[in-house]
Curated annotation (Swiss-Prot):
SMART domains referenced in this protein's UniProt entry, alphabetically: KOW
Function according to Swiss-Prot or TrEMBL: One of two assembly initiator proteins, it binds directly to the 5'-end of the 23S rRNA, where it nucleates assembly of the 50S subunit. One of the proteins that surrounds the polypeptide exit tunnel on the outside of the subunit.
Keywords of the record: Ribonucleoprotein, Ribosomal protein, RNA-binding, rRNA-binding
Name of this protein: Large ribosomal subunit protein uL24
Keyword tRNA processing carried by entry: no
UniProt GO molecular function: rRNA binding; structural constituent of ribosome
Any one GO biological process: translation
Organism encoding this protein: Mesomycoplasma hyopneumoniae (strain 7448) (Mycoplasma hyopneumoniae)
Gene Ontology CC: one annotated term: ribosome
């Protein structure tokens, strides 16, 4: 059971996209990375080929390391930024539940 899962809302802690929020689209456990919607956008220039007669410029979300991400306890508003939190685990009724450390509530 991972601390960050697919469809979780996360905030970027460091790097060019610091402070940006997005939903986790995909996890890559082998690289300890995740693809987050709207974060770490890269562009790729494709040359013309037999299949693709016109060259093109593609934009896509590149993976970002999990160590640079934190789960969002409370979403951002106009007045206040998003509150990042660490994740803990608690066993209730023989089930392992994720807990937000800042709020103490189940995720």
């Amino acid at each position: 059971m991972g601390k960050i899962r697919k469809n979780d809302t996360v905030v970027v802690l460091s790097g060019d996209d610091k402070g940006k929020q997005g939903a986790v689209l995909e996890l890559i456990p082998a690289k300890k990375a995740a693809i987050v919607k709207g974060v770490n956008i890269k562009t790729k220039h494709r040359k013309p080929s037999n299949k693709n007669t016109n060259g093109e410029i593609i934009t896509f979300e590149a993976p970002i390391l999990l160590s640079k991400l934190a789960l969002v306890a409370k979403k951002a508003t106009k007045d206040k930024p998003a509150i990042p939190t660490r994740v803990g685990f608690k066993i209730e009724n023989k089930k392992k539940i994720r807990i937000a450390k800042k709020t103490g509530k189940a995720i």
